[in-house]
């Protein structure tokens, strides 16, 4: 079984992999990093005009990193908007994924947080820098192989 976007991508010869449906009936697609920018533009043109959320996670220690996009197709007069979840997996050594900031502006802080916590670089993001951790922080705190330092410097508020 395929969702609407998946069927449309197949019809137009665009490479992806369906990972199935979640408990709400939302299809999850896997897209390669090198195909993500073009498929993101196509998704927007297809009608997915709202990036509900973007997050990232570490799949396994020493394994891949994943950037996850929850897209919604909002239309006037439609009670139940169409949704899709897209996962883009990147290698741990040099995790690079095209930014979708220029397509969905709501990706700005979300991609920055994924960069800050997991070290995924989002190509062509206008302000890709740490957002939660100090610029001097070494490492990526949400990676499963991250070793937390045994000391923290407490800074004054003034």
Curated annotation (Swiss-Prot):
Catalytic activity reported: a plastoquinone + NADH + (n+1) H(+)(in) = a plastoquinol + NAD(+) + n H(+)(out); a plastoquinone + NADPH + (n+1) H(+)(in) = a plastoquinol + NADP(+) + n H(+)(out)
Disulfide bonds: none
Gene3D superfamilies: NADH:ubiquinone oxidoreductase, 30kDa subunit
EC numbers, comma separated: 7.1.1.-
Topology with respect to the bilayer: Peripheral membrane protein
Family statement: Belongs to the complex I 30 kDa subunit family.
Subunit structure: NDH is composed of at least 16 different subunits, 5 of which are encoded in the nucleus.
Name recorded for this polypeptide: NAD(P)H-quinone oxidoreductase subunit J, chloroplastic
């Amino acid at each position: 079984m395929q969702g609407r976007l998946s069927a449309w991508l197949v019809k137009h010869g665009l490479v992806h992999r369906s990972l199935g449906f979640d408990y709400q009936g939302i299809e999850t697609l896997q897209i390669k990093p090198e195909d993500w920018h073009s498929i993101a533009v196509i998704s927007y043109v297809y009608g997915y005009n709202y990036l509900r959320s973007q997050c990232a996670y570490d799949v396994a220690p020493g394994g891949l990193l994943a950037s996850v996009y929850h897209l919604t197709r909002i239309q006037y007069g439609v009670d139940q908007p169409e949704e899709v979840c897209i996962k883009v997996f990147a290698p741990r050594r040099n995790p690079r994924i095209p930014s979708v900031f220029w397509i969905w502006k709501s990706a700005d802080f979300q991609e920055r947080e994924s960069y800050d916590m997991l070290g995924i670089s989002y190509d062509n993001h206008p302000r890709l820098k740490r957002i939660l951790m100090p610029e001097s922080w070494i490492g990526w705190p949400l990676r499963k192989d991250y070793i937390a330092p045994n000391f923290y410097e407490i800074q004054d508020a003034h």
